[in-house]
Structures are given as structure tokens and as C-alpha cells.
């Protein structure tokens, strides 16, 4: 089986590494190198580093449409994307012999869009999962081929859930592709009446307005924004980023009072200071259904 892959962040790496071990990868597409250290140098994406590690041809165009002529004559059975980060034109979706597929971080049709994992946390969901779908011209609207559900416990933040979702996808992806290759699957048409969207979380939305949020909403916002850009509040004119918080007592935590109830922030960072991480023994990974 031959594959063309497209992905960018660390989320994609374990998934692609499993595929590299099992199948022939004709090329990998990723986002261009990005500035680091205040723009003085460029850094390759985690997926580009993976491609270089295995000496696989890698493309990193500003727009994927510009490499159409370079990839149109490649022979591959599947085009698989996982957190690539660009809209893919239909002429590229039509290139594989069998299908173009996408690994999406929600139980579709819930949370179509760029930030499904964060929105599951923001809304305090008790269940989420991975969907493997056909890619179509309409974003995240293709038929569902495979799913893996995950129970949420309310303690995990975006960092934890990205890691867990990536592990779940990497554990299943080889078997899923083999089953689809052998036509051992059934399709589920997405119910358009149940569609919800998950737009990218914006920096301007990261402010924790203590006087306007419920305790539950405060904690869920912290969970959702933990990865980037980080939820924050203002104390004595300075920004304090909060990455983990709970209503359970945590010794030496930074305490915030919301609606008359104490919230213990046990991973936080004051402006200009180092990040503080405190032990909280109730934190544990979620379970797979």
C-alpha cells in the first residue's frame, strides 16, 4: 500500500510514524518552516523533522495548490491528512487511487473545524473521540469510516487530550487503512442537523473574566486554552497565565475566587516569571470506550 501524507504538528507524528513503519510513503506534505526565538531563525514542523528522520521526500508549500504538478504523477492508494492546517483543493483530493482521508479530532458531525479538541474541553464534554472520514470539497463533511471514542474525566487539559488523541489514532490507523483497503468497513453519512463548528481559539478570547464566569466555565476555559495561547487573568496590572486549575485543595497553589468559591491554579505563570507546576494527584488520563 502506498500513501501520501499531510500533517504539521506533534499530534500528527505518532500517527505518521506507525504508517511509515508499515507502508510505503511516497511523500509527506507539511506547513512551511516558522520563525522561532523571536524570529531570528526558522524551525521545521514536527512532521517535517519526522520526514527528514526517515529520508522521505517532503514538501512544505505556503499553499498546497502550488505543488499539484509535482505530486500529480505520484502513484499512491491513499492521501491521508492529520492536522495539516490548509484547505486542500478538490483536484488534489482526486489524486489517490482509492481515497483521500482525514483524521479528525472529534466525533463528527460535532465540532467540524480547526479546534475540535479545544472546543470539547471548553464545553465541558464528557466524551469525545477520533473520526476517520473521506475528504470532500466541504470541510470535515465527508462520510465517517471509523471512530474511536474517549471518555473525559474533567481534569485533562488540551495538552493531555492532544497527546491522548494522537495515541488513540496511531494505535488504530494501520488497521483502519487495511480494512478500508480490503473494503471491510461501512460508511456513516453525517447528519447535517447535528453539525456544530469549532473555530480556532483566538488570543483575544483567552482572558479569564472572573466576574463573568461560573466556576465550571472558568476551569473549562483554562483546560481548552492551555496549549495555545494560554488562558490568563490580570493581577496587579500583570498577566497571569493559568494552565491547570481545580476546585480541590492544592497546597501552594495560586488561588482565584470565582462566584464565592476558591479555585486552585496548580500550573501557572506570572508575567516575566518561570512557569510553576505543582503536583496534583487527582490528575489522570482519560479512558477509551
From Swiss-Prot:
Cited CDD domains = FMT_core_Met-tRNA-FMT_N, Met_tRNA_FMT_C
Domain of life of the source: Bacteria
A Pfam match is: Formyl_trans_N
Q: Which reaction does it catalyse?
A: L-methionyl-tRNA(fMet) + (6R)-10-formyltetrahydrofolate = N-formyl-L-methionyl-tRNA(fMet) + (6S)-5,6,7,8-tetrahydrofolate + H(+)
Q: Which UniProt keywords apply?
A: Protein biosynthesis, Transferase
Give the EC number(s) under which this enzyme is classified: 2.1.2.9
Q: Which SUPFAM superfamilies match?
A: FMT C-terminal domain-like, Formyltransferase
InterPro entries documented for this protein: Fmt (IPR005794), Formyl_trans_C (IPR005793), Formyl_transf_N (IPR002376), Formyl_transf_N_sf (IPR036477), Formyl_transferase-like_C_sf (IPR011034), GART_AS (IPR001555), Met-tRNA-FMT_C (IPR044135), Met-tRNA-FMT_N (IPR041711)
Molecular function as annotated in GO? methionyl-tRNA formyltransferase activity
Q: Which Gene3D superfamilies match?
A: 3.40.50.12230
| UniProt keyword annotation of Signal present | no
Q: Which HAMAP family match?
A: Formyl_trans (MF_00182)
- Family under the similarity heading: Belongs to the Fmt family.
Name of the protein: Methionyl-tRNA formyltransferase
Q: Which organism is it from?
A: Mycoplasmopsis pulmonis (strain UAB CTIP)
Gene for this chain: fmt
